Amino acid sequence: MSKPFKLNSAFKPSGDQPDAIRRLEEGLEDGLAHQTLLGVTGSGKTFTIANVIADLQRPTMVLAPNKTLAAQLYGEMKEFFPENAVEYFVSYYDYYQPEAYVPSSDTFIEKDASINEHIEQMRLSATKALLERRDVVVVASVSAIYGLGDPDLYLKMMLHLTVGMLIDQRAILRRLAELQYTRNDQAFQRGTFRVRGEVIDIFPAESDDIALRVELFDEEVERLSLFDPLTGQVESTVPRYTIYPKTHYVTPRERILQAMEEIKDELADRRKVLLANNKLLEEQRLSQRTQFDLEMMNELGYCSGIENYSRFLSGRGPGEPPPTLFDYLPADGLLVVDESHVTIPQIGGMYRGDRARKETLVEYGFRLPSALDNRPLKFEEFEALAPQTIYVSATPGNYELEKSGDEVVDQVVRPTGLLDPIIEVRPVATQVDDLLSEIRQRAAINERVLVTTLTKRMAEDLTEYLEEHGERVRYLHSDIDTVERMEIIRDLRLGEFDVLVGINLLREGLDMPEVSLVAILDADKEGFLRSERSLIQTIGRAARNVNGKAILYGDKITPSMAKAIGETERRREKQQKYNEEHGITPQGLNKKVVDILALGQNIAKTKAKGKGKGRSTAKAGIVELDMTPKALQQKIHELEGQMMQHAQNLEFEEAAQIRDQLHQLRELFIAAS
């Protein structure tokens, strides 16, 4: 199943890239546990990492700080490795309200969640790829440090089918039920199976568009075929096939029975403690809730909130780390932490918030103390589990620099020859009027401006002032969700407006080549938003434009400003020297605007090729590219209904065309969510 990694790119490494690739590879081969790639904005850090992966041929996990960047990286890696398994592993919740108790108002909030089925399928596909092959790149968010089913139990539960094997039909159906597949002879969808005589059709939970047909003759498996679940057309026959569980949290029956005994023991101990402390209400509440869960587990094999008993189900001791995606990564795997100055602190903060909420639930009798072990990894556990690691950032944090020691690989020279922005410091007294004249100069030549302020009030006032003076301006604030933010950035690039005002416009990793000026108001006010790293990141937003410039408004130069200016000038000097030595003229980036939201479009086209006669690729039109994610989701549901209707009417060509369109819309939805 595994193939060697094959990098697909029209470009060869240039600038600082060849040296960075060589040094990173040497470090990994020498067994270094930690290295840092200090790559400036627009220097092709992802391309460098892709080259390292292709050269070393090692399964890799790429950690991104949020879903937006994870989607962007997923799209880029898909383009670099079209023939290999590039997978996407982020939280599958569209909406998630964890259970909680507020003692002050005696309010219990039930767990409520909405799961995105497409992302759930991609998560299952990611773990399957890690278990089956070595040419895997999994792009993950911090969701990777949260508890997942135990890989050993997951492997034990798999159903292996081979042509010629002797197995009773009822035994197959029973095993499918244990894997949490449901029988549905009417609507054939992901995670279901149907039975027609001696033929069993199974739609694997991790598959998007391929199902398995098991044909039996008496008690022998006569044939295994892969077919299109929509048209019924057989794609190929296979000698063997492995069916993976429908969820990561499946557990063998004997393990459940053993866990139930352990839960009963803990309940008895906890009841004694509560009664001894005269907590009668809490004791009654805990007994009632736990007994109900035990009955559900006995009858169905699972219960609502079964993750709270994960310690018993996976056979761990008190306080031991939960199994996570890291347990699925091979021992010689490679970890790449993108935008590490943001991602590393995030990993450190996850455990504490989760712990505080659960302690209240345990104290007031809503959960057993073992529920505290259903948690994300502690930071020291993450460190112990992480394989050889490359931290990637334009502004690495103290942790990465300390861990890497001298192994910091500089990637300052851009392949395009672009230089870091020129920096000017101007007085605060005239900052608004000065900014207005700078904006007018940029707007006249069709360039864009980013303005960052210190407070929400100032951002609002400045936006109002600029509007009164006839400027096309928008304000980006914390109430705007990720999706709308992406749309605002797209509109800025398209020229719908010229100026974007915000408080924290770092937005690591987002490409805006049209931005030629970054203005930082009150740059001399020391603090989080005006620290050295924040300033360098903000200045870097103008680094993708030939005329890139940053204006820092301040009456004095603070230590953070001095360091940021010094570092930018060091980089600029090195870039200029390289350009002069190699006769390079800086060239602006010409990146299509739809690239931001249509990351998966090419992937969908590739998937649609060569899958049976009569299939024609339905291209996602401009209408779809301009749709909001909410509208996209609505469109997807609408098309799914139409597709099923066509299939029921035996209009398979029309159904297949809609399915191809759905592929593209789902990719667009992932990119935008």
Swiss-Prot record:
Q: Give the residues the record marks as binding ATP.
A: 39-46
The alphabetized UniProt keywords are:
ATP-binding, Cytoplasm, DNA damage, DNA excision, DNA repair, Excision nuclease, Helicase, Hydrolase, Nucleotide-binding, SOS response
GO cellular component assignments: cytoplasm; excinuclease repair complex
**Record domain Helicase ATP-binding: where:** 26-183
GO molecular function, a single term: ATP binding
**Ranges spanned by the short sequence motif Beta-hairpin, renumbered to the chain:** 92-115
For this protein, the record's HAMAP family field holds: UvrB (MF_00204)
Query: In its UniProt entry, what is this protein called?
Result: UvrABC system protein B
What's the source species for this entry?
Salmonella paratyphi A (strain AKU_12601)
